[in-house]
Curated annotation (Swiss-Prot):
It comes from Pyrobaculum aerophilum (strain ATCC 51768 / DSM 7523 / JCM 9630 / CIP 104966 / NBRC 100827 / IM2). GO terms for molecular function: indole-3-glycerol-phosphate synthase activity; phosphoribosylanthranilate isomerase activity. CDD domains: IGPS (cd00331). InterPro entries: Aldolase_TIM, Indole-3-glycerol_P_synth, Indole-3-glycerol_P_synth_dom, Indole-3-GlycerolPSynthase_CS, RibuloseP-bd_barrel. This is Indole-3-glycerol phosphate synthase. It catalyses: 1-(2-carboxyphenylamino)-1-deoxy-D-ribulose 5-phosphate + H(+) = (1S,2R)-1-C-(indol-3-yl)glycerol 3-phosphate + CO2 + H2O. Keywords: Amino-acid biosynthesis, Aromatic amino acid biosynthesis, Decarboxylase, Lyase, Tryptophan biosynthesis. The gene is trpC. Signal peptide: none annotated.
Length: 249
C-alpha cells in the first residue's frame, strides 16, 4: 500500500468519528492579499511522516515568536502523521490569516476549515481524482475560502491554472509517493507557471538563497515548516531576504 492510499483510509476513519465543526465566529480574510507581494507562510508542524519534529513548542508560543515577520500561518490538522489538531487554527488566527493543511478528500473537511476559522484550505491534486479536486476547490470558494491546490509537476500545474475562480497553486518540492524532496524541481515548475497564476512554493525550503530564488520567480510566497519549527528566529532573516528581493523586482 502506498502512502496516499494509506492516507485516504485513515481520513475515512476520521470522518466517521469526528463531530461536526463549530459555527464560524472568526472573520474571513483574503488569504492571497495577506501575502502581499511575497509572503512568508510559517507552518506549525509538530511531526511529519518521517517522524517527530518538535513537541516542546506549543502553538501559541510558536506563533508569538514568528508572527512579526510572517505574512500568514499554515496549520497542520492531520492527527496521525502530523500530530495536528483543528483547535490549533483559532490559536493561529489570533495572530495572522490561516491556511489549513490536511489530506482533504471530503467537503466535511472544508466545512471544518471554515468553522474553525481558516481562510484557506489545502487540496492535494494527486490525492483525489481530477473532477473531485475541482469540486472541492469550488466548494471552498463558495464558502469564501481560498483553495491552495497542491501539485508537484508542470503538467498538473498547467491543468490547475485553467480552473476558474480565485485560487493559489502550491508547488510541492516533495513527491508524495516517495516522500523525497527536490527544491530545484519545484523551481522548474515555478518557471513554467510564471505569469499564468498565483503560486507559492512549499516543502524543503530552509535557506535564504532558496527564499530569494522563489521570490525572483514571482511566487506569491513560500511555506516553511520544519526549518522554522526547529529555529523560529530564522523567520526574521528570511523576511529580510524577501524584502530585499521585492525591492529589486
Amino acid at each position: 500500500m502506498d502512502f496516499l492510499t494509506e492516507v485516504k483510509r485513515t481520513v475515512e476513519l476520521r470522518l466517521a468519528t469526528e463531530p461536526p465543526p463549530p459555527a464560524r465566529s472568526l472573520p474571513l480574510v483574503d488569504f492571497i492579499k495577506s501575502l502581499g507581494e511575497f509572503g512568508i507562510i510559517a507552518e506549525y508542524k509538530r511531526a511529519s511522516p518521517r517522524g517527530v519534529i518538535r513537541l516542546d513548542l506549543p502553538p501559541w508560543a510558536y506563533f508569538a515568536q514568528v508572527y512579526q515577520y510572517a505574512s500568514a500561518f499554515s496549520v497542520l490538522t492531520e492527527p496521525f502523521w502530523f500530530l495536528g489538531d483543528y483547535r490549533f487554527i483559532p490559536i493561529a488566527k489570533a495572530f495572522k490569516p490561516v491556511l489549513m493543511k490536511d489530506f482533504v478528500i471530503d467537503k466535511r473537511q472544508i466545512e471544518a476549515a471554515y468553522g474553525y476559522g481558516a481562510d484557506a484550505v489545502l487540496i492535494i491534486y494527486r490525492l483525489v481524482e481530477r473532477e473531485r479536486a475541482m469540486e472541492l476547490a469550488e466548494y471552498a470558494q463558495r464558502l469564501g475560502l481560498t483553495p491552495v491546490v497542491e501539485i508537484d509537476n508542470v503538467q498538473d500545474a498547467k491543468e490547475v491554472a485553467t480552473w476558474g475562480g480565485r485560487l493559489v497553486i502550491g508547488i510541492n518540492s516533495r513527491d508524495l509517493k516517495t516522500l523525497e524532496t527536490n527544491v530545484q524541481r519545484a523551481f522548474e515548475v515555478a518557471k513554467a507557471l510564471r505569469g499564468d497564476v498565483e503560486f507559492i512554493i512549499e516543502s524543503g525550503l530552509s535557506r535564504p538563497e532558496e527564499v530569494e530564488r522563489a521570490c525572483s520567480l514571482y511566487a506569491r510566497g513560500v511555506l516553511i515548516g520544519t526549518a522554522l519549527m526547529k529555529n523560529p528566529v530564522l523567520v526574521k532573516e528570511l523576511r529580510q531576504v524577501a524584502e530585499r528581493c521585492i525591492a529589486r523586482r
